[in-house]
């Protein structure tokens, strides 16, 4: 039993180290693409601003209408409140990962006590 617990701890340590180091290397390798660098505004000889392809003024009216119709729906998503009885508390408590750790710890304690008594 102790051998299995030791191997499990080694696995957790190795896994957490691999996740930690892979996150560090991924974050350091990310570079800002040249397309997304801030651009200086361009002006023509008449003093009018030259529109870029991604400017909101340059987007066709059909596409602008689509985004305007979607924005109220997106804003209302956060405002919708579900009733408290939508999901029973027993299901919520089973889905909580903190309770999984507590339950596993309690089961391990019971197992160790049973081994010591037996």
UniProtKB/Swiss-Prot annotation:
Region described as Disordered: spans on this chain: 35-66
Signal peptide: 1-18
Domain of life from the UniProt record: Eukaryota
GO cellular component: extracellular region; host cell plasma membrane; membrane
Position of sequence motif RxLR-dEER: 49-64
Glycoprotein listed as a keyword: no
Feature: compositional bias, Basic and acidic residues: 35-65
Keywords: Host cell membrane, Host membrane, Membrane, Secreted, Signal, Virulence
Location in or out of the cell: Secreted; Host cell membrane
Primary localization: secreted
Recorded domain comment: The RxLR-dEER motif acts to carry the protein into the host cell cytoplasm through binding to cell surface phosphatidylinositol-3-phosphate.
Function: Secreted effector that completely suppresses the host cell death induced by cell death-inducing proteins.
Family: Belongs to the RxLR effector family.
UniProt name for this protein: Secreted RxLR effector protein 143
Originating species: Plasmopara viticola (Downy mildew of grapevine)
């Amino acid at each position: 039993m102790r051998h299995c617990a030791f191997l499990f701890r080694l696995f957790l340590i190795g896994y957490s180290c691999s996740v930690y180091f892979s996150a560090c290397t991924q974050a350091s390798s990310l570079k800002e693409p040249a397309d997304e660098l801030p651009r200086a505004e361009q002006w023509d000889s008449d003093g009018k601003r030259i529109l870029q392809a991604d400017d909101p003024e340059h987007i066709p009216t059909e596409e602008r209408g689509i985004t305007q119709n979607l924005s109220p729906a997106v804003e209302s998503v956060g405002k919708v409140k579900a009733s408290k009885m939508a999901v029973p508390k027993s299901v919520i408590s089973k889905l909580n990962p903190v309770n999984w750790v507590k339950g596993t710890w309690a089961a391990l304690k019971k197992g160790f006590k049973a081994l010591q008594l037996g």
